[in-house]
Amino acid sequence: MGAGIAGAMTALHLARRGVRTRLIDRWEPGHSRASSTDYNRVIRAIHGRDEFYTRWARESILRWMELQAETGQKLYYQCGALILATAGHCDWEDATADTFTRMGVPFYRFSPDEIAVRFPQFDPTGISYALYEPEAGMIMAHRGVLTAIDLFRKAGGTVDRGHVMTDDKERLMLDGKPLEADLVVIATGPWMGEMYPRTIKPISRVVGVNVLYTSTPDGSTQFDQDNMPCWIDHGQGSFGIPSCEGSGVKAAVVIPDTIDLDKDERLIRRETLNRTRSYIRRRLPGLVGQQVVDSKFNQIALTPDTHFIVDWHPVHKNVLLAGGCSGHLYKHGPVFGDFVAGVGMRDYGTADRFKIAGRKKLSPKESPSGR
Protein backbone atom coordinates (compact mmCIF):
# COMPACT_ATOMS: atom_id res chain seq x y z
CA MET A 1 0.00 0.00 0.00
CA GLY A 2 1.56 3.25 -1.17
CA ALA A 3 3.43 3.71 -4.45
CA GLY A 4 6.08 6.21 -3.41
CA ILE A 5 9.71 5.17 -3.40
CA ALA A 6 9.36 2.96 -0.30
CA GLY A 7 6.35 1.08 -1.62
CA ALA A 8 7.54 0.90 -5.23
CA MET A 9 10.98 -0.45 -4.33
CA THR A 10 9.53 -2.96 -1.86
CA ALA A 11 7.02 -4.17 -4.45
CA LEU A 12 9.79 -4.47 -7.05
CA HIS A 13 11.97 -6.58 -4.77
CA LEU A 14 9.05 -8.81 -3.77
CA ALA A 15 8.14 -9.36 -7.43
CA ARG A 16 11.74 -10.18 -8.28
CA ARG A 17 11.66 -12.80 -5.53
CA GLY A 18 8.79 -14.47 -7.37
CA VAL A 19 6.08 -13.22 -5.02
CA ARG A 20 2.74 -12.37 -6.62
CA THR A 21 2.47 -8.71 -5.68
CA ARG A 22 -0.13 -5.98 -6.06
CA LEU A 23 0.81 -2.31 -5.58
CA ILE A 24 -2.04 0.01 -4.58
CA ASP A 25 -2.18 3.79 -4.26
CA ARG A 26 -5.01 6.31 -4.00
CA TRP A 27 -3.66 8.30 -6.94
CA GLU A 28 -1.64 7.88 -10.12
CA PRO A 29 1.96 6.69 -9.60
CA GLY A 30 4.26 9.68 -9.26
CA HIS A 31 1.46 11.96 -8.02
CA SER A 32 2.37 15.31 -6.50
CA ARG A 33 0.85 14.64 -3.06
CA ALA A 34 3.50 12.04 -2.24
CA SER A 35 6.59 12.59 -0.11
CA SER A 36 8.54 11.10 -3.02
CA THR A 37 7.48 13.88 -5.36
CA ASP A 38 9.66 16.72 -6.73
CA TYR A 39 12.37 16.62 -9.38
CA ASN A 40 15.33 15.50 -7.32
CA ARG A 41 16.78 14.46 -3.97
CA VAL A 42 20.25 14.70 -2.44
CA ILE A 43 22.05 11.37 -2.05
CA ARG A 44 25.00 11.43 0.32
CA ALA A 45 26.65 9.15 2.85
CA ILE A 46 26.96 11.99 5.37
CA HIS A 47 25.12 10.76 8.48
CA GLY A 48 27.04 11.96 11.53
CA ARG A 49 28.38 9.08 13.60
CA ASP A 50 25.88 6.60 12.13
CA GLU A 51 27.75 3.88 10.22
CA PHE A 52 24.58 1.94 9.38
CA TYR A 53 23.07 4.63 7.15
CA THR A 54 26.50 5.53 5.79
CA ARG A 55 26.85 1.96 4.49
CA TRP A 56 23.29 1.98 3.17
CA ALA A 57 23.84 5.25 1.31
CA ARG A 58 27.05 4.00 -0.29
CA GLU A 59 25.30 0.81 -1.38
CA SER A 60 22.27 2.76 -2.61
CA ILE A 61 24.42 4.87 -4.93
CA LEU A 62 25.61 1.65 -6.57
CA ARG A 63 22.05 0.31 -6.78
CA TRP A 64 20.80 3.52 -8.42
CA MET A 65 23.64 3.28 -10.93
CA GLU A 66 22.68 -0.34 -11.68
CA LEU A 67 19.06 0.67 -12.25
CA GLN A 68 20.26 3.47 -14.51
CA ALA A 69 22.33 1.03 -16.57
CA GLU A 70 19.47 -1.49 -16.69
CA THR A 71 16.82 0.95 -17.88
CA GLY A 72 18.72 3.64 -19.76
CA GLN A 73 17.00 6.27 -17.59
CA LYS A 74 19.18 9.04 -16.16
CA LEU A 75 18.63 8.61 -12.42
CA TYR A 76 21.87 9.73 -10.75
CA TYR A 77 24.06 12.80 -11.16
CA GLN A 78 27.38 12.70 -9.31
CA CYS A 79 27.83 16.38 -8.51
CA GLY A 80 29.11 15.91 -4.95
CA ALA A 81 27.72 17.25 -1.68
CA LEU A 82 29.06 20.10 0.45
CA ILE A 83 28.23 20.19 4.15
CA LEU A 84 28.71 23.62 5.69
CA ALA A 85 29.66 23.50 9.38
CA THR A 86 28.51 26.58 11.28
CA ALA A 87 31.08 27.99 13.70
CA GLY A 88 30.31 26.80 17.22
CA HIS A 89 27.80 24.16 16.08
CA CYS A 90 29.87 21.51 14.31
CA ASP A 91 29.12 18.34 16.31
CA TRP A 92 27.33 16.52 13.48
CA GLU A 93 29.94 17.48 10.90
CA ASP A 94 32.78 16.55 13.28
CA ALA A 95 31.15 13.15 13.84
CA THR A 96 30.71 12.66 10.08
CA ALA A 97 34.40 13.30 9.44
CA ASP A 98 35.32 10.71 12.08
CA THR A 99 32.90 8.18 10.56
CA PHE A 100 34.21 8.73 7.04
CA THR A 101 37.79 8.30 8.24
CA ARG A 102 36.93 5.01 9.99
CA MET A 103 35.00 3.67 7.00
CA GLY A 104 37.29 4.89 4.24
CA VAL A 105 34.69 7.13 2.58
CA PRO A 106 36.42 9.72 0.34
CA PHE A 107 35.98 13.31 1.53
CA TYR A 108 37.76 16.64 1.70
CA ARG A 109 37.77 19.25 4.44
CA PHE A 110 37.87 22.87 3.27
CA SER A 111 38.52 26.05 5.22
CA PRO A 112 36.34 29.12 4.55
CA ASP A 113 39.02 30.54 2.24
CA GLU A 114 39.21 27.25 0.35
CA ILE A 115 35.41 27.15 0.02
CA ALA A 116 35.46 30.61 -1.58
CA VAL A 117 38.00 29.43 -4.16
CA ARG A 118 36.75 25.89 -4.81
CA PHE A 119 33.04 26.73 -4.72
CA PRO A 120 32.67 30.46 -5.41
CA GLN A 121 28.88 30.13 -5.52
CA PHE A 122 28.87 30.12 -1.69
CA ASP A 123 29.63 32.97 0.70
CA PRO A 124 31.34 31.17 3.63
CA THR A 125 30.62 33.86 6.22
CA GLY A 126 29.95 32.23 9.59
CA ILE A 127 31.25 28.84 8.43
CA SER A 128 34.00 27.08 10.40
CA TYR A 129 34.76 24.55 7.66
CA ALA A 130 33.05 22.38 5.05
CA LEU A 131 33.09 18.67 4.27
CA TYR A 132 32.93 17.75 0.61
CA GLU A 133 31.83 14.25 -0.40
CA PRO A 134 32.78 13.90 -4.10
CA GLU A 135 30.89 10.64 -4.70
CA ALA A 136 27.58 12.12 -3.52
CA GLY A 137 25.07 13.81 -5.79
CA MET A 138 21.39 13.80 -6.66
CA ILE A 139 18.73 11.28 -7.61
CA MET A 140 16.00 12.28 -10.06
CA ALA A 141 13.11 11.64 -7.68
CA HIS A 142 9.99 11.61 -9.85
CA ARG A 143 11.77 9.65 -12.56
CA GLY A 144 13.10 7.20 -9.98
CA VAL A 145 9.61 6.34 -8.71
CA LEU A 146 8.22 5.83 -12.21
CA THR A 147 11.24 3.72 -13.20
CA ALA A 148 10.80 1.44 -10.18
CA ILE A 149 7.10 0.99 -10.95
CA ASP A 150 7.83 0.24 -14.61
CA LEU A 151 10.34 -2.43 -13.57
CA PHE A 152 7.79 -3.81 -11.10
CA ARG A 153 5.24 -4.23 -13.88
CA LYS A 154 7.84 -5.92 -16.09
CA ALA A 155 8.56 -8.32 -13.21
CA GLY A 156 4.90 -9.40 -13.25
CA GLY A 157 3.44 -7.04 -10.64
CA THR A 158 0.13 -5.23 -10.96
CA VAL A 159 -0.58 -1.59 -10.08
CA ASP A 160 -4.08 -0.59 -8.98
CA ARG A 161 -5.90 2.47 -7.69
CA GLY A 162 -7.68 2.16 -4.34
CA HIS A 163 -8.30 3.79 -0.97
CA VAL A 164 -6.91 1.87 2.00
CA MET A 165 -8.14 2.77 5.47
CA THR A 166 -8.37 1.12 8.89
CA ASP A 167 -11.29 0.62 11.25
CA ASP A 168 -11.29 1.41 14.98
CA LYS A 169 -9.25 -1.75 15.63
CA GLU A 170 -6.68 -0.79 12.98
CA ARG A 171 -7.85 -3.56 10.67
CA LEU A 172 -7.28 -2.82 6.99
CA MET A 173 -10.11 -1.93 4.65
CA LEU A 174 -9.71 -1.49 0.87
CA ASP A 175 -12.44 0.64 -0.66
CA GLY A 176 -14.64 -0.11 2.35
CA LYS A 177 -14.13 -3.89 2.36
CA PRO A 178 -11.84 -5.99 4.59
CA LEU A 179 -8.43 -6.48 3.01
CA GLU A 180 -6.96 -9.95 3.21
CA ALA A 181 -3.52 -11.08 2.04
CA ASP A 182 -0.65 -13.23 3.26
CA LEU A 183 1.47 -10.09 3.58
CA VAL A 184 0.46 -6.44 3.53
CA VAL A 185 3.22 -3.81 3.47
CA ILE A 186 2.00 -0.37 4.50
CA ALA A 187 4.24 2.25 2.89
CA THR A 188 1.82 5.17 2.87
CA GLY A 189 4.32 7.77 4.09
CA PRO A 190 2.75 10.57 6.14
CA TRP A 191 -0.69 8.91 5.88
CA MET A 192 0.54 5.98 7.98
CA GLY A 193 -0.01 7.89 11.22
CA GLU A 194 -3.62 8.61 10.29
CA MET A 195 -4.19 4.98 9.36
CA TYR A 196 -2.64 3.77 12.63
CA PRO A 197 -3.51 6.38 15.28
CA ARG A 198 -2.52 4.13 18.19
CA THR A 199 0.49 2.34 16.73
CA ILE A 200 2.24 4.93 14.53
CA LYS A 201 0.87 8.41 15.17
CA PRO A 202 2.62 8.78 18.58
CA ILE A 203 6.00 8.36 16.84
CA SER A 204 5.34 10.08 13.51
CA ARG A 205 4.90 13.84 13.14
CA VAL A 206 4.01 15.20 9.70
CA VAL A 207 5.77 18.41 8.74
CA GLY A 208 5.83 20.37 5.50
CA VAL A 209 8.91 21.65 3.69
CA ASN A 210 8.61 24.48 1.18
CA VAL A 211 11.06 24.38 -1.72
CA LEU A 212 11.87 27.14 -4.22
CA TYR A 213 13.64 26.90 -7.57
CA THR A 214 15.52 30.04 -8.61
CA SER A 215 16.64 30.82 -12.16
CA THR A 216 20.34 30.70 -12.92
CA PRO A 217 21.87 33.97 -14.22
CA ASP A 218 21.71 34.63 -17.96
CA GLY A 219 24.55 32.99 -19.84
CA SER A 220 26.11 31.47 -16.70
CA THR A 221 26.79 27.79 -15.98
CA GLN A 222 28.19 28.45 -12.50
CA PHE A 223 25.08 27.12 -10.75
CA ASP A 224 24.62 24.03 -12.95
CA GLN A 225 25.28 20.54 -11.57
CA ASP A 226 28.47 20.28 -13.63
CA ASN A 227 29.99 23.11 -11.59
CA MET A 228 28.16 23.19 -8.25
CA PRO A 229 27.50 20.53 -5.59
CA CYS A 230 24.39 19.80 -3.57
CA TRP A 231 24.69 21.31 -0.11
CA ILE A 232 23.43 21.13 3.47
CA ASP A 233 23.65 24.19 5.70
CA HIS A 234 22.38 23.07 9.11
CA GLY A 235 23.25 26.35 10.79
CA GLN A 236 20.74 28.09 8.52
CA GLY A 237 18.27 25.21 8.47
CA SER A 238 18.78 24.95 4.74
CA PHE A 239 19.73 22.59 1.95
CA GLY A 240 19.82 22.77 -1.81
CA ILE A 241 20.60 21.25 -5.19
CA PRO A 242 22.20 22.88 -8.23
CA SER A 243 20.27 23.41 -11.43
CA CYS A 244 19.85 20.18 -13.38
CA GLU A 245 17.97 19.55 -16.60
CA GLY A 246 16.83 23.17 -16.56
CA SER A 247 15.22 23.05 -13.11
CA GLY A 248 16.84 26.13 -11.60
CA VAL A 249 18.67 26.09 -8.27
CA LYS A 250 16.70 24.31 -5.56
CA ALA A 251 16.89 25.89 -2.12
CA ALA A 252 14.84 25.19 0.98
CA VAL A 253 14.85 26.85 4.36
CA VAL A 254 13.19 24.26 6.57
CA ILE A 255 10.33 25.86 8.49
CA PRO A 256 8.35 22.95 9.99
CA ASP A 257 4.81 23.48 8.78
CA THR A 258 1.59 21.70 9.68
CA ILE A 259 -0.61 20.24 6.98
CA ASP A 260 -3.97 18.53 6.63
CA LEU A 261 -2.95 15.79 4.20
CA ASP A 262 -6.35 15.42 2.57
CA LYS A 263 -7.63 19.00 2.63
CA ASP A 264 -4.72 21.44 2.28
CA GLU A 265 -3.47 22.57 -1.11
CA ARG A 266 0.22 22.01 -1.90
CA LEU A 267 1.15 25.69 -2.08
CA ILE A 268 4.20 27.31 -0.51
CA ARG A 269 3.83 29.93 2.20
CA ARG A 270 4.74 33.61 1.67
CA GLU A 271 6.92 33.43 4.80
CA THR A 272 9.01 30.73 3.14
CA LEU A 273 9.48 32.80 0.00
CA ASN A 274 10.84 35.69 2.06
CA ARG A 275 13.02 33.48 4.27
CA THR A 276 14.50 31.65 1.28
CA ARG A 277 15.30 34.87 -0.57
CA SER A 278 16.97 36.20 2.58
CA TYR A 279 19.04 33.01 2.78
CA ILE A 280 20.04 33.30 -0.88
CA ARG A 281 21.23 36.87 -0.31
CA ARG A 282 23.52 35.67 2.49
CA ARG A 283 24.80 32.39 1.13
CA LEU A 284 24.38 32.49 -2.67
CA PRO A 285 24.94 36.13 -3.63
CA GLY A 286 25.28 35.27 -7.32
CA LEU A 287 21.56 34.46 -7.40
CA VAL A 288 20.42 37.80 -5.98
CA GLY A 289 17.85 39.35 -8.30
CA GLN A 290 17.05 36.10 -10.09
CA GLN A 291 13.41 35.06 -10.39
CA VAL A 292 11.74 32.13 -8.68
CA VAL A 293 10.79 29.80 -11.54
CA ASP A 294 9.14 26.93 -9.66
CA SER A 295 8.12 25.80 -6.19
CA LYS A 296 7.17 22.56 -4.45
CA PHE A 297 5.54 21.70 -1.14
CA ASN A 298 6.89 18.44 0.28
CA GLN A 299 5.74 16.71 3.43
CA ILE A 300 7.73 14.29 5.54
CA ALA A 301 6.91 11.88 8.37
CA LEU A 302 9.38 12.72 11.12
CA THR A 303 10.16 10.17 13.84
CA PRO A 304 11.66 11.26 17.19
CA ASP A 305 15.08 9.72 16.43
CA THR A 306 14.82 10.21 12.63
CA HIS A 307 15.21 6.44 12.15
CA PHE A 308 12.92 4.70 9.68
CA ILE A 309 10.06 2.39 10.66
CA VAL A 310 10.16 -1.25 9.54
CA ASP A 311 8.19 -3.35 11.99
CA TRP A 312 5.23 -5.69 12.25
CA HIS A 313 1.93 -4.41 13.58
CA PRO A 314 1.62 -5.58 17.20
CA VAL A 315 -1.84 -7.12 16.64
CA HIS A 316 -2.23 -7.77 12.92
CA LYS A 317 0.71 -10.07 12.32
CA ASN A 318 0.58 -10.04 8.52
CA VAL A 319 0.89 -6.24 8.36
CA LEU A 320 4.38 -4.81 7.99
CA LEU A 321 4.71 -1.06 8.53
CA ALA A 322 7.45 0.57 6.44
CA GLY A 323 8.20 4.30 6.38
CA GLY A 324 9.06 7.08 8.80
CA CYS A 325 11.14 8.80 6.13
CA SER A 326 12.33 11.64 8.40
CA GLY A 327 13.51 13.49 5.31
CA HIS A 328 16.26 11.05 4.33
CA LEU A 329 14.64 7.82 3.09
CA TYR A 330 14.37 8.49 -0.63
CA LYS A 331 18.06 8.11 -1.40
CA HIS A 332 18.11 4.74 0.39
CA GLY A 333 15.17 3.53 -1.72
CA PRO A 334 16.74 0.51 -3.48
CA VAL A 335 18.35 -0.84 -0.30
CA PHE A 336 15.32 0.02 1.85
CA GLY A 337 12.96 -1.83 -0.49
CA ASP A 338 15.22 -4.88 -0.60
CA PHE A 339 15.46 -4.90 3.21
CA VAL A 340 11.69 -4.53 3.71
CA ALA A 341 11.01 -7.34 1.23
CA GLY A 342 13.35 -9.62 3.18
CA VAL A 343 11.66 -8.77 6.48
CA GLY A 344 8.25 -9.30 4.87
CA MET A 345 9.25 -12.75 3.61
CA ARG A 346 10.68 -13.46 7.08
CA ASP A 347 14.15 -14.12 5.72
CA TYR A 348 15.40 -12.10 8.70
CA GLY A 349 14.08 -9.82 11.41
CA THR A 350 14.06 -6.07 11.35
CA ALA A 351 16.83 -3.92 12.81
CA ASP A 352 16.40 -2.68 16.38
CA ARG A 353 16.55 0.94 15.20
CA PHE A 354 13.51 0.36 12.97
CA LYS A 355 11.24 -1.07 15.68
CA ILE A 356 8.18 0.88 16.76
CA ALA A 357 8.91 0.67 20.48
CA GLY A 358 11.55 2.63 22.38
CA ARG A 359 11.74 5.77 20.26
CA LYS A 360 13.41 8.82 21.77
CA LYS A 361 14.90 12.12 20.65
CA LEU A 362 18.62 11.95 19.82
CA SER A 363 21.26 14.64 20.12
CA PRO A 364 22.40 16.24 16.84
CA LYS A 365 25.66 14.28 16.99
CA GLU A 366 23.78 10.98 17.41
CA SER A 367 21.00 11.72 14.94
CA PRO A 368 21.56 10.29 11.44
CA SER A 369 19.97 13.37 9.91
CA GLY A 370 21.54 15.97 12.19
CA ARG A 371 18.06 17.12 13.27
What are these regions (language model features)?
Residues 66, 87-156, 160-161, 167, ...:
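Flavin (FAD/FMN) cofactor-binding and adjacent substrate-gating region
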Residues 139-220:
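Predominantly flavin-linked oxidoreductase catalytic cores and closely associated redox partners
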Residues 279-371:
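C-terminal catalytic lobe of FAD-dependent flavoproteins
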Residues 21, 107, 184:
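Hydrophobic anchor at the start of a short beta-strand
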Residues 2-6:
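Glycine-rich Rossmann-fold phosphate-binding loop(s) that bind the pyrophosphate
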Residues 15-36:
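Glycine-rich FAD pyrophosphate-binding loop
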